[in-house]
A protein has these predicted regions:
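Extreme N-terminal leader/anchor segments
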Residues: 1-18, 23-24, 62
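Metal- and O2-centered redox machinery and metal/ROS homeostasis
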Residues: 12-20, 28, 52-58, 69, ...
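Acidic/His metal-coordination segments adjacent to aromatic residues that form catalytic metal sites
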Residues: 19-39, 101-129, 146
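Alpha-helical scaffold segments that form or flank carboxylate-/histidine-based iron centers
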Residues: 30-41, 59-78, 125, 150-164
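Long, contiguous alpha-helical bundle segments
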Residues: 42-45, 130
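Internal, conserved structured core segments that host functional sites
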Residues: 111-164
Length: 166
């Protein structure tokens, strides 16, 4: 099978609504782009928990502390789930989980820039949760039908849990 035929077969699978798995043949650009996108998503989930975790000890009530701790735990878990499936996809590129994380420290991997903003007040924490999680629900729900099967499956869980954060 020529490269053009493999690409045509790959695109036909996507057009039929089939899901692509990590072990399936895929064009190099599809793999590289997906790794970069999922890496950014994973790191955004993890980095998004950092400003909010600072508020756990200062939350105004025990109920708010518990709620915020659960949210931080969810966000860290989302990041770990997405990073795990990114690891499988990146393996044929010779990248390990350690390499993916190292990319964050070298600036090769990014995360949403909203997480660079400080949250000096409890109100900031609430607004961040409302706006950022609201946007996450909308943007991630749009990706539920992703052609990459592992990502689509993880997003089902992530989207269900993000809905509780608003």
């Amino acid at each position: 099978m020529t490269d053009e035929e493999r690409l045509a077969a790959f695109m036909a699978r996507i057009e039929r609504g089939e899901k692509i798995e990590a072990s399936d043949w895929m064009p190099a650009q599809y793999r590289v782009t997906l790794v970069k996108f999922m890496q950014m998503h994973a790191f955004s989930e993890i980095m998004g928990a950092l400003p909010e975790k600072e508020w756990v000890p200062r939350a105004p009530t025990l109920a708010r502390k518990l709620s915020l701790m659960a949210k931080v735990q969810d966000e860290m878990g989302h990041g770990q789930l997405i990073l795990r499936i990114t690891e499988d996809l990146a393996a044929p590129l010779g990248k390990t989980r350690e390499d993916l994380v190292a990319d964050l420290f070298t600036g090769q991997a990014k995360f949403h820039n909203v997480f660079h903003m400080p949250a000096p007040t409890w109100a900031d924490c609430g607004v961040i949760g409302w706006l950022v999680d609201g946007a996450a629900v909308v943007s991630q729900a749009a990706l539920l039908d992703s052609s990459y099967g592992p990502y689509a499956r993880v997003l089902q869980r992530v989207c269900a849990e993000e809905g509780f954060h608003i």
